[in-house]
Structure formats: C-alpha cells, structure tokens
C-alpha cells in the first residue's frame, strides 16, 4: 500500500476549477466551430453561429432546466415533436461548447506531459502505420494474444464519475449529467437505440470525449496493475489513477481473485515480463510470450477487473485467446499473422557439404481482400462477387472529375496498404476501381468500355494507375540495385493519422 500511495503522489494531476463560467463566453462557441486556433479572433471571421451569445446560452440552459423530464419521457416526446425538436436544439447547442471546454484540462495535461518528458509533439507520433514496425519487432517472438473487445454499454453515471477524477468543477459535472439524461433514462444503460444513436451522431465531439475518458480510466488502472505484475516496469505511459475509494476497490478486486489481501501475492499468478498492449478504437490486444494457461489467468483477471471497478458485466466471450502461429489478427484494416519463413543454407567444409534448414518467424501483414471487396460493393464500385460496375451517381460529372475521384480513392488505398506483404490482393482492388471508372465514363458517353478506351486512349488513366513504386521512382530517378528491392518491400508511412474509410469495416 505504501508503494501505491507513492505512486499516487507522483501522478497527482492538477486541479482545474471554474470551468463552468466558460460556457457563457461567446468565443468558446467560436472555437468549437472553428478549430484553427492560430488565427486571431479579432481579425478573422471564425464562421460560427452568431446566436451563441452570453444571453442566448443563459436562456437555453434555463429552458433546459425548466423542462420536466420526469413527466416528458422519451416515449412522450415521440408524441410531441415540437418539444423534442426544441429540447434537442438546446442540448446540442450547449453540448458543443461544453465538449470544447472539458477538453481544455486534457489538452493542458497532455502538453505538460510532453514537456516533462521532452517529447516533440510531432504529427509522425500520431501515424497509424507507426505501430506496425513495433509489431514486426516484437510480435514475431510472442506466442499468444488476447483479442479484447472493450465492453459497453456503460451507465451514464459511470461516465460522469470518470470525468470527476479529472475535473473538480461540480457545476460542469451537473450540466453533463443533465445533458446525458436528456437522452437516456436514469436507470437504463447506454444501448444502441435510436436515442443514443441520434445523440452520438449529433454530438460526436462530446461522445468521443466521454468514450475516451472511459477507456483511459480502464487503461490507467490496467497499466498500473501490469507494472505491479512485472519486474520490467513500463516507462512509456503516463498513468493517472482514481483517487476516490481507490484502496477499497483494489482490496475488493484482490479478494475476489484469491480471497487474500496481499496484492503482490495475487499478481504473482499472472506475472509475465514479456507482454505488449496495443489499442485502437474499441479493440485492444494483449500479446504475451507465455502459455495458454497464463493467458487464461489474465482473461479471468480482466473480466473480474471490469465487473468490479466499472460495475459492468463483461462477458468472457468478448476476449479471445489465439495463438499467433495459426491465427490471423484483424487490426487497423490489415490481417496480421506470424508465419514461419523457411530458408535453406548450403554449407561446405573442405570436401563435405551439407544443408542447414532455418525457420525464422516473420510478421505478415495482408490485405483482407474479401472484407475490402465487401466495402467496395457497399460503396457501389462492384457487386458482392467483386465484378466492377459503373457508378451512376458520378455519371453527371466531368470526365476529369470522374477520373480524379477514382484516382484519389485508388491512391489512398494504395498508400494505406503499402505495408502489405503481398501486393496481389491490392492489385485486384485497383483493377476493380480502374474498370469501374472506365464503365462510369462509358456510361456517361453511352458507349462500351472497349470503344471508349480505344477512342480516347488509355492515357486518361495514367494518373489513376500510378503506384507507390512509381512515386518512389520519381523521388529516386535512377535507383540502385539496393533500392529496387525497396520497391517490392513493405513501406510504412508516417503521415496516416486515420484509418481509410473503405478499410474501416463495420
């Protein structure tokens, strides 16, 4: 317990009080609608709604609190569309400014953390592709992974409590609680109903803030427990823990696991020095060099942790234990797996010669062709079998605009999947887009694809057909023999900060 107390003292976050008055400042809504903070608010037109003034916001909050939400439930609001429209307008207007205000403590804390650790705030640190070189270096030596789907739904009060550990402004928390309960009943959970779906779409900024704070709360506890269970302490993550009832919850968690109060004795059961954790969106991966028995212990530990700390039912089937050698992991739009790469070396000593068989583990990243074709079919570029079709919606555009749109999609996919181990599937996707482009142009000119290409020539598709290898050849006009191998190898870029829409399978 003394070590935990010292840990809390080192990681004590700053208290940020008096955020609630910022809701009534007009420039907050200007920033909420225009994220270019480098421009002067006095000399530039920020393009926000001029109705978001001090007086208007005060009236909106007053009207929101005057509504009797216990009488007008969600079912009653369906019978009164006028009340629903006005109430949604009040909540959405205030929530936009509120989400921006609550982000202030998080951004300040992140900035101070970078300054303390002397880390340069570079865009390259945010690149999605930067995680794959890490997987190449570490996952090839591991045996098992826990494929975890972060559980939800979460009760709205738990979301408010998570923010309470970061914010000390009670008025702001009361307003957040009121906004959330405008869409969900107090005794219900956040479920994918029409109300919650409407809330998440209209208030994406606030919804993402709440979800990220919920995931951060889980990860802060998890990293702390992970550090306690290993001799190799993690130094790359800044960890903040809940201050309220921390010792009591840790004691309950430990008692459930083995019925004793010694934290180290319990964590000894899951001690594993070689373990890696990766998360993106609602999916996380816990990879280890241990055995399946050890991974089952971690699975039980995580299920117990979620149920007791978040008062949330975490079904064990949301965690899958897979062996890396015979399982493909779907992550960030790629299918990743560890395969044995055999190599034969012929050695000769004097008159004797013999062959040496070596098998090296290698991480392969493949294009999930079937999932990608399903995304293309959903976007009306091909049918479900992968046969290209025309895009009639774009047939009214100019030829150059049509080619530019198809070419941009092809380049973006080629750019995102440049790290694929095998390019054959990527070439098939580019073929579908190329033929779909040709059929769209032929449909516009009321001609066949063959006649259209013969009449206008294939030079119209030169930009569309440019590959990553062509871009490299333009960068290095006369490549050496060593660079020729680079063209055929995997290329990871540090400028990709979000997943491609077609690769984001849902």
Swiss-Prot record:
The keyword RNA-binding applies. One of its GO terms (molecular function) is RNA binding. It holds the Pfam family Intron_maturas2. The keyword Chloroplast applies. One of its GO terms (biological process) is tRNA processing. Keywords: Chloroplast, mRNA processing, Plastid, RNA-binding, tRNA processing. It comes from the Eukaryota. GO terms for cellular component: chloroplast. Its main location: plastid. InterPro entries: Domain_X, Maturase_MatK, Maturase_MatK_N. It is found in: Plastid, Chloroplast. Belongs to the intron maturase 2 family. MatK subfamily. Usually encoded in the trnK tRNA gene intron. Probably assists in splicing its own and other chloroplast group II introns. This is Maturase K.
């Amino acid at each position: 317990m003394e070590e935990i107390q010292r840990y809390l003292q080192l990681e004590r976050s700053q208290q940020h009080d008096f955020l609630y008055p910022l809701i009534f400042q007009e420039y907050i809504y200007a920033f909420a609608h225009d994220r270019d903070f480098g421009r002067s608010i006095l000399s530039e037109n920020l393009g926000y709604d001029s109705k978001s003034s001090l007086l208007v916001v005060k009236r909106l909050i007053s009207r929101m609190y005057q509504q009797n939400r216990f009488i007008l439930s969600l079912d009653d609001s369906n019978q009164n569309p006028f009340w629903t429209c006005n109430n949604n307008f009040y909540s959405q207007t205030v929530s936009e400014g509120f989400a921006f205000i609550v982000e202030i403590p998080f951004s300040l804390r992140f900035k101070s953390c970078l300054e303390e650790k002397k880390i340069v705030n570079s865009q390259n640190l945010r690149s999605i592709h930067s995680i794959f070189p890490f997987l190449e270096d570490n996952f090839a030596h591991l045996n098992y992974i826990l494929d975890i789907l972060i559980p939800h739904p979460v009760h709205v009060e738990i979301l408010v409590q998570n923010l309470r550990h970061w914010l000390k402004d009670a008025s702001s928390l009361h307003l957040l609680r009121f906004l959330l309960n405008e869409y969900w009943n107090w005794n219900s959970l956040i479920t994918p109903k029409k109300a919650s779906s409407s809330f998440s779409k209209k208030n994406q900024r606030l919804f993402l803030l709440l979800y990220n704070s919920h995931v951060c709360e889980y990860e802060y506890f998890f990293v702390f427990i992970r550090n306690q269970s290993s001799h190799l302490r993690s130094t790359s993550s800044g960890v903040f823990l809940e201050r309220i009832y921390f010792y009591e919850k840790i004691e309950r968690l430990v008692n459930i696991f083995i019925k004793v109060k010694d934290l180290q004795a319990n964590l000894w059961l899951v001690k594993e020095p070689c373990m890696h954790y990766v998360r993106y969106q609602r999916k996380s991966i816990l990879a280890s060099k241990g055995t399946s028995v050890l991974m089952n212990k971690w699975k039980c530990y995580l299920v117990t942790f979620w149920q007791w700390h978040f008062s949330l039912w975490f079904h064990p089937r949301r965690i899958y234990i897979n062996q890396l050698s015979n399982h493909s992991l779907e992550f960030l739009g790629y299918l990743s797996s560890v395969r044995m790469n055999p190599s034969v070396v012929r050695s000769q000593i004097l008159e004797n010669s013999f062959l040496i068989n070596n098998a090296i583990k290698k991480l392969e990243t493949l294009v999930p062709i079937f999932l990608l074709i399903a995304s293309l079919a959903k976007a009306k570029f091909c049918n479900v079998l992968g046969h290209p079709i025309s895009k009639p919606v774009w047939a009214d555009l100019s030829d150059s605009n049509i080619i530019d749109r198809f070419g941009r999609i092809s380049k973006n996919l080629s750019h995102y999947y440049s790290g694929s181990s095998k390019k054959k599937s990527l070439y098939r996707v580019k073929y579908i887009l190329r033929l779909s482009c040709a059929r769209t142009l032929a449909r516009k000119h009321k001609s066949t694809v063959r006649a259209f290409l013969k009449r206008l020539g294939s030079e119209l598709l030169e930009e569309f057909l440019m590959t990553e290898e062509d871009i490299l050849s333009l960068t290095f006009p006369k490549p050496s023999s060593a660079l020729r191998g680079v063209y055929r190898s995997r290329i990871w870029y540090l400028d990709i900060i979000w997943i491609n829409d077609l690769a984001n399978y849902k």
